[in-house]
Amino acid sequence: MDSDDSFVKTAHVIETSTPENKKLSHRFKSVEIVPPSSSNDDPFGFSSTKGIRLSSINSNDLVNTLSKGFNETSNMSYNRILPSSPPTLEIGEIDYNEALQIRSADENQQSVPTVSIASPSTPELPPSSSPLLPPNGSESSSPIPLSLLSTSSLQQRKITPSNLSNTSKPMDSKQLERLIPVPHGHHLTRLRKKRRRDDDIDLSGLYETKSSSPPAIHSDEDPSYSDSIARSPVKSAFNLRKRRKGVKEKKILKTYHSQDKDTASDNDNNTGSSDEENDNLKELTPGKKEYLKSIKKYFQDVDDYQLHVVNEG
């Protein structure tokens, strides 16, 4: 303010010195020196500058036109700048350094937003006389009360099967099978297999190792053989019929070959006399005698037929 007082004193001296400078002194009377504003009332960083408002009686004077432009830039108001938004500056309206000061002052004035965790309503902050103290004893700069940080809303929610579906019922086995990951690719096996029903056939017997020895031949009259067939769970009706048929065929072929061998040996040893044949037939039962006669007749007819065909050919 010492420079301002000297400036006013010099203006007073010029006014009383010469009559030629009365016109200039008349202008200096209207000079108003505005003291610098405080930092609280100056959010845009004009505390380092001095606003000088010049007013002249003559409106057409050049000083008046310059003062209007200077007043427009120096006296920026809040009317065209919202308090929540940063100040909008036009090109050439303010210097770059002053713009940085405006930005820093605006950031300092913005209040720290209060975050609500427990409820959407804004929590009440404690008074400044009782600062918050964290567990370690140091002062806390956060305006959020520590009691709000240990709420039930911050706890992790437990995932239950009822939460996975819209209904409150627990998930059944089919729904749980959908959650099992199934690997893809020909070299990977499926983790989830089809659940076997109670009425399905037990196929474990198909994977048993079979012995190299042939199966023993049982007669149809043997009760143990029929019981073993009935108890086997893997045998189907087709396999049973096929097995029984094979057993019967083997029995017939066995008896046929044994009788055929006996007759062949008899024919080789005999001289062809009917007496020896009759003696052999006497040792046999009547049923076997008729059976052998029918076989001989059959083969004799076959031989005659072949010879007859050859003779005609």
Curated annotation (Swiss-Prot):
Q: Where is this region: C-terminal Sororin domain?
A: 288-310
Q: Motif location (FGF motif)?
A: 44-46
UniProt lists compositionally biased (Basic residues) regions at 184-196
- Keyword entries, A-Z: Cell cycle, Cell division, Mitosis, Nucleus
Here the segments flagged for biased composition (Pro residues) are 123-134
Per the record, what phenotype accompanies loss of this gene's function? During metaphase, cohesion defect between sister centromeres leading to a slight increase of split sister centromeres; this phenotype is attenuated when wpl1 is also disrupted.
Superkingdom assignment: Eukaryota
Ranges of Low complexity composition bias in the record:
135-154
Q: Name one GO biological process term.
A: mitotic sister chromatid cohesion
Keyword RNA-binding listed: no
**Cellular localization per UniProt:** Nucleus
GO CC annotations, alphabetized: nucleus
Regions of compositional bias (Basic and acidic residues) in chain numbering:
249-264
User: In this record, what's one Pfam family?
Assistant: Sororin_C
User: What this chain does, per the record?
Assistant: Regulator of sister chromatid cohesion in mitosis stabilizing cohesin complex association with chromatin. Antagonizes the action of wpl1 which stimulates cohesin dissociation from chromatin. Cohesion ensures that chromosome partitioning is accurate in dividing cells and may play an important role in DNA repair.
| Recorded family membership | Belongs to the sororin family.
Q: How does it assemble?
A: Interacts with Pds5 and Psm3.
Note on file?
Named sororin after the Latin word 'soror', which means 'sister', because of its critical role in sister chromatid cohesion.
**Mind telling me what this protein is named?**
Sororin-like protein 1
Name the encoding gene, please: sor1
